[in-house]
């Protein structure tokens, strides 16, 4: 009972004086439930917990899937719909596309571990479709960087998350980061959280 009525995981859970779900729901945080669960299993080999929480992980991806348009691109949500970073004026659509691909692959791995071939194949197809769309519509050949939103914004978050998602190979990713650092786009990074992912990429 620690989710929204539709099953979405909240961005925050208060534990004192009793368990209370925060009313802030951020799509990237919800998707990371599955990625975190996968990482937890890989560190602990706790199959029972993996199995118990797998349905919740699957549900987060189902909810996120509703946010895509006919081109398989992430639509801009209403209000404070995703975190990504505190950068003012940050267009988050391409970064969120990357988070979705990244988490779909993690949830695919969960399904494979649990022997759910149907769910694993579904997540594999989702990741492939969203990756193809990112390459077709979000990669700007002129700058050699990913762009985001109607304004075709170039920001750190889009590059980082689409690289971490595996939308490009490691060599291409390195080239993108080199171009990014050289360009120094206006929309940089604010939080240690985002800087950590930049280093990881």
Explain the meaning of each model-derived region.
Residues 1-201:
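Active-site core of glycosidic bond-cleaving carbohydrate-active enzymes
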